[in-house]
């Protein structure tokens, strides 16, 4: 039996709280069970140097974990003086996922940065961050429209992500930490509303997985992400 007596294909309870902080143009607290991530979207009227004069905008992301978001305290990366490889990989993944659903030309020459800070980690922090960041980004874009800066929302749709894996020989959806740390195969899947995939990250930690198992995991992810997309639409009243 899975933790919390979940079925193999069952997603943890998902909660998306909008307008969580005061100052950011878009602010969301997203909760996947006991995993909690704060996602704040900031709009700046500038673009990176490589986009100067290109008549388009940019969407980027940063990711971090609070020192006591895990079972034992981690040292802040700022105290170490550099970001770790895992952090850089995750924030690039978040940014790529968000750009997949934004018309950068329609955004104009401005940058939206989404800061994703893990308050509490119990597996799936990057997938929760992507799912929450999308809602925060949507709110930031909607504010640009409401303020008369843009005529239309540049977002082309929604994007969400979930973890799947093989634990004790079973394909499971939305892994908690205890499952993730014991998984034979661990995979993160990012998908947009029409079912197309943005990214698939899959690794066999123990035995290699078969082609059939890959298809089974992708099917589980598709089911789970559709539930997350429904939660996003409900939160945004779309």
Curated annotation (Swiss-Prot):
Signal peptide segment: none
Catalysed reaction equations from the record: tRNA(n+1) + phosphate = tRNA(n) + a ribonucleoside 5'-diphosphate
Keywords per UniProt: Nucleotidyltransferase, RNA-binding, rRNA processing, Transferase, tRNA processing, tRNA-binding
Protein residues bound to phosphate: 86, 124-126
EC number(s) from the headed UniProt entry: 2.7.7.56
GO MF, one annotated term: 3'-5'-RNA exonuclease activity
Alphabetical GO biological process terms: rRNA catabolic process; rRNA processing; tRNA processing
Function: Phosphorolytic 3'-5' exoribonuclease that plays an important role in tRNA 3'-end maturation. Removes nucleotide residues following the 3'-CCA terminus of tRNAs; can also add nucleotides to the ends of RNA molecules by using nucleoside diphosphates as substrates, but this may not be physiologically important. Probably plays a role in initiation of 16S rRNA degradation (leading to ribosome degradation) during starvation.
Subunit structure, interactors included: Homohexameric ring arranged as a trimer of dimers.
Family, as annotated: Belongs to the RNase PH family.
NCBIfam families reported in the protein's UniProt record: RNasePH
UniProt protein name: Ribonuclease PH
Organism: Actinobacillus pleuropneumoniae serotype 5b (strain L20)
């Amino acid at each position: 039996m899975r933790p919390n007596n979940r079925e193999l294909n069952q997603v943890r309870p998902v909660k998306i709280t909008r307008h969580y902080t005061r100052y950011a143009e878009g602010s969301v607290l997203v909760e996947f069970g006991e995993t909690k991530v704060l996602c704040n979207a900031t709009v700046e009227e500038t673009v990176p140097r490589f986009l100067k004069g290109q008549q388009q905008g940019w969407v980027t992301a940063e990711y971090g974990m609070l020192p006591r978001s895990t079972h034992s305290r981690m040292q802040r990366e700022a105290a170490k003086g550099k970001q770790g490889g895992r952090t850089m990989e995750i924030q690039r993944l978040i940014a790529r996922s968000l750009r997949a659903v934004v018309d950068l030309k329609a955004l104009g020459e401005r940058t939206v940065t989404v800061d994703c800070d893990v308050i509490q980690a119990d597996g799936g922090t990057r997938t929760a961050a992507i799912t929450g960041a999308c809602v925060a980004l949507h709110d930031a874009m909607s504010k640009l429209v409401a303020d008369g800066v843009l005529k239309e929302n540049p977002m082309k749709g929604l994007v969400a992500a979930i973890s799947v894996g093989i634990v004790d020989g079973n394909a499971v959806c939305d892994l908690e930490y205890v499952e993730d740390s014991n998984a034979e195969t661990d995979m993160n899947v990012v998908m947009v509303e029409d079912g197309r995939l943005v990214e698939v990250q899959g690794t066999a930690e123990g035995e290699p997985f078969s082609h059939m198992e890959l298809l089974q995991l992708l099917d589980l992810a598709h089911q789970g992400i559709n539930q997350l997309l429904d939660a996003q639409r409900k939160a945004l009243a779309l």
